[in-house]
Amino acid sequence: MLRQLRLTMDISGWIFLPWRRSMSNMKDSPPPPPPLASTFDDVIVDYEDPDYLPLPEYPVRPNEPLETRKQRLLYQSRKRGMLENDLLLSTFAAKHLQNFSAEQTAQYDQLINGVSNDWDIYYWATEVKPTPKEYDTEIMGLLKEHVKNAERVTRLRQPDLNA
């Protein structure tokens, strides 16, 4: 406990050392103004309807070539921000994405980019929660089968990009 307190005091000394040096050069100048009472970090936004949160819509890319879209989706499947979906979606994309038609690719794009919460995708794919009708597509069925892992493939890391 004492060690942690001493470490905290040392760290705070390092943080405030530049401020102390600048203040020692300003002996006759007025003190700095106090910090603003409210910054954007501490503003609490409370909506009347807690189920509704205004989220920006994902931009539709109608003129994107199919190969470019598949490359973008492969990247987005690997970089989800949560390890569970990184592993599930990257292995799914490596297995199926190159064989998708334009319509299937659009469905996959809508699935991974239309949902605002990645945990929803995870819960739907693992069948913890029911899938909403707009996302219950052929692609979601393939993803659910992929998650069941009937082949018993070990998925401890993402597949290589050049494989």
Swiss-Prot record:
It comes from the Eukaryota. The keyword Transit peptide applies. Gene3D superfamilies: Flavinator of succinate dehydrogenase. GO terms for cellular component: mitochondrial matrix; mitochondrion. SUPFAM superfamilies: YgfY-like (SSF109910). Interacts with the flavoprotein subunit within the SDH catalytic dimer. This is Succinate dehydrogenase assembly factor 2-A, mitochondrial. The lineage of its organism: Eukaryota, Metazoa, Ecdysozoa, Arthropoda, Hexapoda.
